[in-house]
Structure formats: structure tokens, C-alpha cells
Amino acid sequence: MIDVQSRFDSRNIRVDKVGVKDIRYPITVMDKTNGIQHTVASVNMYVNLPREFKGTHMSRFIEILNEFHGNLDIREFPSILQSVQEHLSAESAHLELSFSYFIKKLSPVTGCAGLMEYGCRVAGSLDSNRGHDLVLEVNVPISTVCPCSKEISSYGAHNQRGMVRLAVRFKKFVWIEDLVRLVECAASSEVYSVLKRPDEKFVTESAFDNPKFVEDVVRDIAKELKADQNISWFLVDVENFESIHNHSAYACIERSK
């Protein structure tokens, strides 16, 4: 049959990324406690398109994805990217997985168990000139108490939930749980899925004793990452959904090591 995608394109413009986006697909994630965790990811797959070709072959992305069915996890990224690059005759290949990861957490006083959901993302690329690249990202909800509000108020301080996005490049394998724990330790308080009254009292009082600006949170996380020899690059940003303001508070640090 006629291959329209392989026809010559006269516009002489290279396409940086072309492919398929938002494929819902089952994946396996390494779980520090249970060995593995099954979840569902939103998958994006791209390649570059040379200036002389009209289009890429979209069906080949899905075929490659199906080849790795049952073994689609972070350890297979190099093999998947190489397969994409070879099958589509591309200079660069890209694979992105966005998924929910669940961690069992106990409430701090009564020990009630509940599952916390964390949004995660793994983005990998393979380039003929630059080689492999892999970034792991976690999104962690936190709670903060405003230091200024505590300092100037007689009856308490305003507090709010926030979201921390932490992305890292690493030399050896990194557990999602360890990144989550690093973030939660930098907050005024962790966020829990189940709290009884004794737990709520503890969380409220401990957060009040540990007030944090977004600047404090982002700096505390960056300090730990700078000392970690396994981390070669990181980006951390914090957004607080302010409870008494009509805006969010935001801070960001990005560093290469």
C-alpha cells in the first residue's frame, strides 16, 4: 500500500516531537515495601521527524508499547526508547509516564491505616548525540503554618495545604517513598488520609510548633538534595494554596551538581 507518511515534504522544517499522547496503560512500579505495585499510567511517546518526511508512523508507537506489556516499568526505559528510536528511524525518542502511586500511612497517634495517593511522573529520552536521560518526579501534598501569622497573632495562625513538586536526575535507583519522605519532613506537617481526634490534635499542635514559609520548605528540601551524592540534578517547587489570600504562594529551586 502507499506509504503517505514517507513521502517527501518540501517545507524543509524539522519537527522536534511527534507521536501519541495520553494513552491509558497498565504499568508496574517498584514498591519499597511490597516489591511491586500495579497502577495505570497516562503514556506519551514521541520521536523527532526529519525535515524530508511528511509524517511519522503512529501505529508503531502502540506496537512497541504492547511489546513491553507486563514489563513496563522504569527499569525498561532504555530498552523501550531504543526500540522506539530504531523502529521509527529517529534521532531522538521520548517516553513519559504519569501515574498515581499509593503509600500506606499510619496516623501519628492512633495508628489508623490509610492509603495516600501521590502523583508521579517518569520522563525518559534517548538522543543519538546526547545519550539517555531520565527524570523522576513526585507531587506531594503538605500542610504549612504561616510564621508571620503566628508571630503577630494572639489567637493562632493561618495554615493551608500545599503541593510540592520534586523532580530529580540520579546516578543509582531512587525509591519514590524516599523522595516522598524527604518532602514530608520539610513541611510544617504531613497530610494524612485518616485522622482520629487524638491524631488531629497532634497534627494541629505539631504544625503550629513548626511554622514554614514556602521559602523554608523549598530550601530545606534543596539542602538535603545538595548533600545527596546520588542526585545529579533537581528541581523543587512549592505552591501553598493560601487560606486567607486570593492567591497562592510559590517558591522554586533548580540546581545541577
UniProtKB/Swiss-Prot annotation:
Keywords: Hydrolase
Catalytically driven reaction(s): GTP + H2O = 7,8-dihydroneopterin 3'-triphosphate + formate + H(+)
Pathway of action: Cofactor biosynthesis; 7,8-dihydroneopterin triphosphate biosynthesis; 7,8-dihydroneopterin triphosphate from GTP: step 1/1
InterPro entries reported in the protein's UniProt record: GTP_cyclohydrolase_FolE2, GTP_cyclohydrolase_FolE2/MptA
Transmembrane segments: none
Swiss-Prot/TrEMBL GO biological process terms: tetrahydrofolate biosynthetic process
Site feature location: May be catalytically important: C146
The protein's Enzyme Commission number: 3.5.4.16
Annotated GO MF terms: GTP cyclohydrolase I activity
Role, per record: Converts GTP to 7,8-dihydroneopterin triphosphate.
Family statement: Belongs to the GTP cyclohydrolase IV family.
Name of protein: GTP cyclohydrolase FolE2
